[in-house]
Amino acid sequence: MMKGSRRTGNNTATTLNTPVVIHATQLPQHVSTDEVLQFLESFIDEKENIIDSTTMNTISGNAADADAAAVANTSLNIDTNLSSSISQLKRIQRDFKGLPPAQDFSAAPIQVSTTEKKETSIGVSATGGKKTTFADE
């Protein structure tokens, strides 16, 4: 028998389930595009360094340690969250630079060829429906 209607489970604190408070102390100031690009670049570089350091720590970490699996799982979770956030920030950065979205050109282009099928006859059935007969190839 289930108690309550709320599912207990992975309740990690995120900005979606934790309140965020912003206190305005000054009048709003406009920021130039160059300042935004500088901030984004430094923020992305800092977070990529964190990802690199956590992956290097898990690779070269203590394998004999009993908590190695828990540490690896935590760093994997951090890595997944950061990498998805960084990809979104890189899209914003490209948008501020006025560049088109990044595309993966490593795959071979797909060529689609179409062939025309010729109808042989269109008839009306006794119940009023349309019957189309196609030529067999």
Swiss-Prot record:
Modifications the protein undergoes after translation, according to the UniProt entry: The N-terminus is blocked.
Where does the secretion signal sit in this chain? none
For this UniProt record, the keywords arranged alphabetically read as follows: DNA-directed RNA polymerase, Nucleus, Phosphoprotein, Ribosome biogenesis, Transcription
The record's section on Gene3D superfamilies has: 6.10.250.3390
Q: Which GO terms describe its biological process?
A: nucleolar large rRNA transcription by RNA polymerase I; regulation of cell size; ribosome biogenesis; termination of RNA polymerase I transcription; transcription by RNA polymerase I; transcription elongation by RNA polymerase I; transcription initiation at RNA polymerase I promoter
Q: Where in or outside the cell?
A: Nucleus, Nucleolus
User: Carries keyword Nucleus?
Assistant: yes
Indicate what this protein is called per its UniProt record. DNA-directed RNA polymerase I subunit RPA14
Task: From the UniProt record, report the name of the gene that encodes this protein.
Answer: RPA14
